[in-house]
Amino acid sequence: MIHVVKYDIQTRSELNLREHWAARHRRATKQKQAVVWTMYEAVRAPGWKIYFPVYVTLTRIGPRALDPDNCACSFKHVQDAIASVLGVDDGDTKRVRWTYKQRKGMPGEYAVEAVFKCKGA
């Protein structure tokens, strides 16, 4: 069973940012809220069912590519929010496996696409 959810958010690498803690907190809160609301809408859709273990592929869409370390780091708040909605710890590799990708978007286009793959009952 495969489900695809797209979040219209801009992710940034947390590793290279030098900013005030309040700005970082605001960005994290906005990302988490956007993901949680979109996930709740998706979960209520007919036919939506998640069976564990689930394989989640997060794809960053943006005008420029990040190096692999920064790409994975940019999903921190997205991953935390998805795990929260699924009711699991994001570090529980027996129930959730995470994969990170990125693809080039149009100028000014930012989004995250999550693909959930699980074996149905």
Model regions: which residues?
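Catalytic phosphate/metal-binding cores of nucleic-acid and nucleotide-processing enzymes, i.e., regions
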Residues: M1-A121
